[in-house]
Structure formats: structure tokens, C-alpha cells
């Protein structure tokens, strides 16, 4: 089956996930435009179009989203942790809400949002910010033509993000115990390769249902393979 060539607008394209995703999309023949801050274009992979704007303010870039059919929101606090509540409030929440507004104003058909696995016993403020964006996405899908895919990883293991590997034996044990099995699956680790594969799949195969977003939890993300 011949895949349709997608026109993808990405916020957060210079980050841990963004650069690799752009490379993967370009290699598969898709058109990619990335939002960057002033002076940030040097960190983008070659071959990508870019515009300068503020990811926290939809009015700074919404007019540049068209003719994209897909908007991918990847902006967030680097290396999120329990002590970064203020950053989640100032960056993760407004950037997510701005992406929804930009998608609507740009008449994008499909919004792809990377949220976080939930519920969880820690990272409450991070989950709160991401959940608020999910709520806004559901509202937008219910009131417009917009479709959405929400991916909920817990931790993406890859270059510079590998410390949770030491927890793998504990995850293996937790998956075997009935009372911890569901939580271990929901809060499991995914690799950087799996995350990029899942994002590419989501972009290339948008949902048909316009009544609400589809949600991919950790087990579904883990099925992703490098393009």
C-alpha cells in the first residue's frame, strides 16, 4: 500500500524526540516544518523548513501552520522531575494549549500530542499539566473537525536518558505479580526507537474517528519500530 505523503508541523523539533522524528519523517518522504526560537534553527536536521516563533503563544505561529495536515506537539520541560512543578506550569501546560489553538486556527486535521502515563504515584504536577492539555484536546475534537492521537509514555530510554535501565529487574518482577501487573505495564519503559516508530505510525495512519482522540498507552507505544 502506498502511503500518503504527509505535511507535518512540529513544535519541539530540536529536542530529544523531535530531531529523530524529523529525520525519520524526511527519510520517508514527508514534508516537515518546525517551529524554533530565534537562533534555534542550527539545531534542526538538514532538509527541514522552519519558522521562528514562541511555542507558548499560538498567535506567534498559527498563521504559518497551513498547509500542514498534521501538527505534532513535543515542547516540554527537559528531563522532567518532581522538583520542576513551576516549569511544568510555565512551559508544558501553555505550550500544549497553544498547540491545540494553532491546530484549530491552521485547520489541521490531525494533532499528535505526547502526554504522560497516568495515573502514577509520583510526578503529580507533571501529570496535572499534561492532563489539562488532554482535556482541551478532547474539547476541541468534540467541537470541530480535529482528530487527535495522544501518546502516553512514562520514560523514554535513549541517549542521555538511560538511568531507568537499572530498574528493569524490578519491572520484570512487578509484571509477574497480580497486584502490580497493571501498573508495571502502564508505567513501563519504552525505547527511543520505539517512541519514534510509534510517532511515525501515528502520523502516517491518523484516526478516522472524529468523536474523540485515540490514546496509545505504553504497551501500544512499545510496538513501535524504527522506520
What are these regions (language model features)?
Residues 40-98, 102-105, 203:
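NAD(P)H-binding glycine-rich loop region in Rossmannoid oxidoreductase-like domains
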Residues 189-227:
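Alpha-helical substrate-binding/gating segment
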Residues 7, 69-70, 110:
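Structural motif
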Residues 149-178:
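Flexible, glycine-rich beta-alpha linker
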Residues 4-28:
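N-terminal Rossmann NAD(P)H-binding glycine-rich loop of SDR-like oxidoreductase domains
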Residues 31, 39, 77-135, 140-149:
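Conserved Rossmann-fold NAD(P)-dependent oxidoreductase catalytic core, especially the SDR/UDP-sugar
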Residues 172-190:
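A conserved pocket-lining segment of Rossmann-fold NAD(P)-dependent short-chain dehydrogenase/reductase
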Amino acid at each position: 500500500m502506498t502511503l500518503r505523503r504527509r505535511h507535518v508541523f512540529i513544535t519541539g523539533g530540536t529536542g530529544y524526540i523531535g530531531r529523530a522524528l524529523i529525520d525519520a519523517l524526511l527519510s520517508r518522504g514527508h514534508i516537515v516544518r518546525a517551529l524554533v526560537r530565534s537562533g534555534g534553527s542550527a539545531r534542526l536536521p538538514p532538509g527541514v523548513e522552519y519558522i521562528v516563533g514562541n511555542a507558548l503563544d499560538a498567535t506567534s505561529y498559527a498563521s504559518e501552520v497551513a498547509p500542514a495536515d498534521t501538527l505534532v506537539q513535543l515542547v516540554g520541560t527537559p528531563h522532567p522531575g518532581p522538583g520542576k512543578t513551576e516549569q511544568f506550569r510555565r512551559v508544558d501546560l501553555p505550550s500544549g494549549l497553544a498547540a491545540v489553538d494553532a491546530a484549530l486556527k491552521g485547520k489541521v486535521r490531525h494533532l499528535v500530542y505526547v502526554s504522560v502515563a497516568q495515573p502514577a504515584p509520583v510526578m503529580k504536577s507533571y501529570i496535572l499539566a499534561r492532563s489539562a492539555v488532554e482535556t482541551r484536546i478532547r474539547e476541541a475534537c468534540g467541537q470541530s473537525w480535529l482528530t487527535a492521537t495522544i501518546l502516553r509514555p512514562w520514560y523514554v530510554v535513549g541517549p542521555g536518558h538511560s538511568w531507568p535501565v537499572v530498574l528493569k529487574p524490578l519491572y520484570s518482577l512487578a509484571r509477574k505479580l497480580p497486584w502490580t501487573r497493571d501498573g508495571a505495564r502502564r508505567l513501563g519503559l519504552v525505547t527511543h526507537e520505539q517512541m519514534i516508530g510509534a510517532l511515525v505510525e501515528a502520523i502516517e495512519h491518523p484516526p478516522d474517528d472524529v468523536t474523540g482522540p485515540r490514546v496509545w498507552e505504553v504497551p501500544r507505544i512499545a510496538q513501535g519500530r524504527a522506520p
